[in-house]
């Protein structure tokens, strides 16, 4: 039994992956994701918040949500396969606090590879997908 009155917070969040599932075709995807990105951009310390995306992200949109772009690294990819491997590299390198990506549908092996990369880089991964 944990005594929450005396329990100490964890100094570093555990590495690993989190999935966020959005309804396909919704025009409010930006409104769901950007507040999280803004929060994470202010929590990353000396490490990057890396966002791997296929779509260009307008600078004004980032400004509207108060994203700290001085700690945000945007990486644009051409397709799901490229996004998968860029995400793996960003997770494994260890210079990102969190890597956000939408690599498309992943099989079990690909998901496990990303999990191992996050552990190797002591990094959080946020995978966004649509259903």
Predicted region positions:
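Residues at the starts of beta-strands that form the adenosine-phosphate
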Residues: 47-48, 71, 124
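Long, charge-dense
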Residues: 52, 56-97
